[in-house]
Swiss-Prot record:
GO terms under biological process: tricarboxylic acid cycle
Stated family: Belongs to the MQO family.
Gene label: mqo
The protein's name: Probable malate:quinone oxidoreductase
Enzyme Commission number(s) from the entry: 1.1.5.4
Cofactor requirements of the protein: FAD
Reaction(s) catalysed (UniProt annotation): (S)-malate + a quinone = a quinol + oxaloacetate
Keywords: FAD, Flavoprotein, Oxidoreductase, Tricarboxylic acid cycle
Enzyme class (EC, first level): oxidoreductase
UniProt organism field: Wigglesworthia glossinidia brevipalpis
Lineage start: Bacteria, Pseudomonadati, Pseudomonadota, Gammaproteobacteria, Enterobacterales
Oxidoreductase found in the keyword field: yes
Length: 510
């Protein structure tokens, strides 16, 4: 996308104020990648539906979807070791890796379709080829990586994966991680050439820029949804604050999607649906070390993921990433966990405390008691100085110099805590759709893998909220045009996997 396109995608014209007690078909709360994806689905499937989207900030995609607030990894389980666990018999469970990879392939199909339809423009502004690598040292970790490679290689999705313990080969793949390292040090790496770096914020902006220029779609920035109430006719009444006019308006909607990231839990609680009882959120922030030094950025073209320390949560996997943000190449290393009681980067310090209820306080306390390693990890992270964080970087880049790197604060993640009969409360690290009994209201809670699986996750949501339409010929016909693998399993055939990937790679210029 040229400079003018970038400026255009940021300039969202202001609509006239909402009319009191307006009735609409769908309300999208939040303007991140999830709401953008659901919004484009509904506009393609039901162009005559009236859709309102409310965003409390003055721009779309400014929380977790923003390029600087996430790692930008097209999560495809190529390099993330936490998606492959060890079974009791010592074998490797690759089921989650398959699910995550297939989900990302679905996202690429959606973006390819949107490029063909000129809804998205200039694919290099939001997705670029960056090989994905796993990199470990130490005998136990090397044995794990070798075994993981063996099991993944047998599946069509990962058949093209490479493995090496050879110093020179790994140095060719990623020079910076081997410079300054002894040639006798035992290390191992895997590599997938077709990995990507994704700017989810750019995708979000471009989709909303298209949507807000279409009839029957209304984007309201600086509008904050503060309450959701069930009407007698089973529709939903939303109280919306116009932060420009300092006015509260009521709006009625047949369907509501709460896609406001960390803000979703509190709005879900306000809806008072039975299914929300017992859910809580645990906020975890993140920091990255970043460099724009061209001597470094020009000498590293990969996303290199390591192995988490024992007891550390999945979101703690250390990685050194090539990023392309607004056309500029940078390197990021992290994440380093931070703690704030905010549920959103631009949220309130009261977020955590105001989300506490008599139903979720016990699950939260039980999670703290039952996850001592997590608590210990977070305390250690909070006590770690910039020098300590730089020392972690040196494990991956032995020749790194502190003067080249600065520390940035990324977005907030709110992990799911929910009631459990046996343990009282459990901490979940994935995402989960919570919906009302009649499926007219849904919320997305949780974090990783998040944005990478947005197309697949919102397809699942379509099946829940619009179960009476998803199998009708009109919707099926359209969905089959968008997704050439719709309702098919990609991983069952290597030839089919190649066909799908060649199709999307050609359109997305990968």
């Amino acid at each position: 996308m040229n400079k003018k396109n970038h400026e255009d995608s940021n300039s969202f014209k202001k609509y006239s104020a909402i009319k009191e007690n307006d009735s609409v078909d769908v309300v999208l709360i939040g303007s991140g990648i999830m709401s953008a994806t659901l919004g484009i689905y509904l506009k393609l499937l039901e162009p005559n539906w009236i859709i309102h989207s409310y965003e409390r900030l003055n721009k779309v995609g400014q929380e977790s979807s923003n390029a600087w607030n996430n790692a930008g990894t097209g999560h495809s389980a190529f390099c993330e070791l936490n998606y492959t666990s060890i079974n009791k018999d010592g074998s490797i469970n690759i089921s989650k890796a398959i699910k995550v990879n297939e989900s990302f392939e679905i996202s690429k199909q959606l973006w390819a379709y949107l490029i063909k339809e000129k809804i998205l423009v200039n694919s290099s502004s939001f997705i670029n080829t960056v090989p994905h690598m796993s990199f470990v040292w130490g005998e136990n970790n090397i044995n794990f990586l070798k075994k993981r490679f063996f099991y993944l290689k047998q599946n069509a999705l990962f058949k093209d994966m490479l493995y090496s313990e050879n110093y020179d080969i790994i140095k060719k793949w990623a020079p910076l991680i081997m410079e300054g390292r002894s040639i006798n040090e035992k290390v191992a790496a895997t590599r997938m050439e077709i990995g990507t770096d994704v700017n989810f914020g750019e995708i979000t902006k471009q989709i909303f820029y298209y949507l807000k220029n279409k009839s029957n779609f209304f984007l309201y920035l600086n509008h904050d949804v503060i309450d959701i109430i069930r009407n007698k006719d089973k529709t939903w009444c939303l109280k919306v604050v116009d932060n420009i006019l300092k006015k509260t308006i009521k709006i009625n909607s047949k369907y509501v999607f709460i896609g406001s990231g960390g803000g979703a839990l509190k709005l879900l609680q306000k809806s008072k649906i039975e299914q929300s009882i017992g859910y809580a959120g645990f906020p975890v922030g993140g920091q990255f070390l970043v460099t724009k030094n061209k001597k470094l950025t020009n000498n590293h073209q990969a996303k290199v993921y390591g192995k988490s320390p024992i007891g550390a949560p999945p979101m703690s996997v250390p990685h050194i990433d090539t990023r392309i943000i607004n056309g500029e190449k940078v390197l990021l290393f992290g994440p380093f966990a931070t703690f704030s009681s905010k549920f959103l980067k631009n949220g309130s310090y009261f977020d955590l405390f105001s989300s506490l209820t008599k139903e979720n306080i016990i699950p939260i306390l039980q999670v703290g008691i039952n996850n001592f390693n997590l608590v210990k990890y977070l305390i250690n992270q909070l006590l770690k100085s910039k020098r300590g964080k730089f020392n972690d970087l040196c494990k991956y880049l032995p020749t790194a110099k502190m003067k080249d790197w600065s520390l940035i604060t990324a977005g907030q993640r709110v992990q799911i805590i929910k009631k459990d009969i046996e343990k009282g409360g459990i901490l979940e690290f994935g995402t989960e759709i919570i919906n009302s009994k009649d499926c007219t209201l849904s919320a997305l809670l949780g974090a990783s893998p998040g944005a990478s699986t947005s197309a697949s996750t919102m397809l699942d949501l379509l099946k829940i909220m619009f179960y009476d339409k998803i199998n009708k010929s009109e919707w099926k016909s359209k969905l089959n045009k968008i997704f050439i693998s719709y309702n098919k399993k990609i991983h069952e055939s290597y030839e089919y996997t190649l066909e799908i990937r060649n199709y999307t790679s050609k359109i997305l210029s990968l």
